[in-house]
Regions:
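Bulky hydrophobic segments
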Residues: 7-14
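Hydrophobic alpha-helical membrane segments
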Residues: 14-199
Length: 199
């Protein structure tokens, strides 16, 4: 029997030991659990969102499935940047928790007649980050572009070096961040209020 100090526990610790988790969920949640053990002791790594990005990812995976949940959680990681508060406060439905964290639930509220075209935003994401920029979040778009381009560059380098394992890992991350960019552009466009609100 392992004795664990209560202060060392993270929200994922008790969940990870449940029998109801699938193999895929366990495989994905283990790195998140490891991250929580590291980050929860570092005040500089406190998340500006409520739920934290790691707990948001866990919730997304459990409620939306491994693939869709991972894409949704990865979108949140991209959005957790220096412009997050500014973008959050532009949303008429935004909420701030008592401790100043940004309330960003998994189920978000879309505008019935959004001010930006979700179809165009999603289509523009063929070039990573462009759809987010079109939807009014250029900083998110820049982060998304840098992540997708960085992993694409690494993938190309590992292909040239004939390293199939690193090629596969980098290509997987490139694809994940690119899929998250499509989702994020769509989500952002759906949340943009109309320019001229209906009377």
């Amino acid at each position: 029997m392992q004795i664990v100090n209560a202060q060392d526990l993270t929200p994922l610790d008790s969940l990870y030991h449940q029998d109801s988790l699938t193999f895929g969920q366990r495989a994905l949640l283990k790195p998140i659990q490891t991250w929580q053990h590291f980050s929860y002791g570092q005040s500089a790594l406190n998340c500006q969102f409520e739920k934290s990005c790691s707990n948001f990812m866990v919730q997304a995976v459990l409620e939306k499935g491994v693939l869709r949940g991972t894409v949704i959680g990865t979108d949140r990681i991209v959005r957790c940047n220096s412009a997050a508060r500014h973008y959050h406060l532009q949303n008429p439905h935004s909420k701030i928790q008592y401790d100043g964290r940004l309330v960003d639930p998994l189920e978000w509220k879309s505008e019935p007649a959004p001010g930006k075209s979700p179809l165009l935003a999603t289509s523009l994401s063929i070039i990573p980050g462009l759809g987010r920029a079109y939807a009014g979040h250029p900083v998110d778009g820049l982060f998304s572009f840098l992540l997708v381009a960085g992993f694409a560059y690494n993938t190309y380098g590992h292909i040239k070096a004939d390293n199939p394992i690193r090629t596969g890992i980098n290509a997987s991350f490139m694809t994940l961040f690119w899929l998250a960019d499509f989702y994020g552009a769509y989500r952002t466009a759906k949340m943009v209020p109309p320019k001229f609100p209906q009377p």
